[in-house]
Amino acid sequence: MLVKTISRTIESESGFLQPTLDVIATLPADDRSKKIPISLVVGFKQEASLNSSSSLSCYYYAIPLMRDRHINLKSGGSNVVGIPLLDTKDDRIRDMARHMATIISERFNRPCYVTWSSLPSEDPSMLVANHLYILKKCLDLLKTELGE
């Protein structure tokens, strides 16, 4: 079970409109086994002057269904099952982690863990405005690293 861990800071192209993201990803080094999960830790970049550290806000797990075992699945439905391993009272954070894990698991056909980390003082409303931006940037990073 060979994995590689990468750490990236994803800068915004438009400056202040989208936040800078910190992403740590653990990816399979060998793409033959579809059982090795993709793991992401994602959060907004924190200023170096802040002395408080980010904390775990939500931890979500998603796994693709075996298509040959579930022939009766309706087309158009999700082929991924997921569950929060650590839930949060904030729906915005949970939805972000759930969408990321589900989309990544379906796109790369392997299990996926997504961790969202944030400061206690962080405003989760930033997630609503930047939901698609965060998804796109994380998917682009994974496509590049996994060679797809």
UniProtKB/Swiss-Prot annotation:
Signal peptide (from-to): none
InterPro entries: Psome_chaperone_3/4
Any single Pfam family the record assigns to this protein: POC3_POC4
Subcellular localization, as worded in the UniProt entry: Cytoplasm
Broad class of where this protein is predominantly found: cytoplasm
One GO cellular component, as annotated: cytoplasm
Keywords, sorted A to Z: Chaperone, Cytoplasm
One of the GO biological process terms: chaperone-mediated protein complex assembly
Subunit structure: Component of the 20S proteasome chaperone. Forms a heterodimer with IRC25 that binds to proteasome precursors. Interacts with POP2.
Stated family: Belongs to the PSMG4 family.
Note: Present with 2210 molecules/cell in log phase SD medium.
Its job: Involved in 20S proteasome assembly, facilitating the alpha-ring formation. Involved in maintenance of telomere length.
Protein name, UniProt field: Proteasome chaperone 4
Gene that encodes the chain: POC4
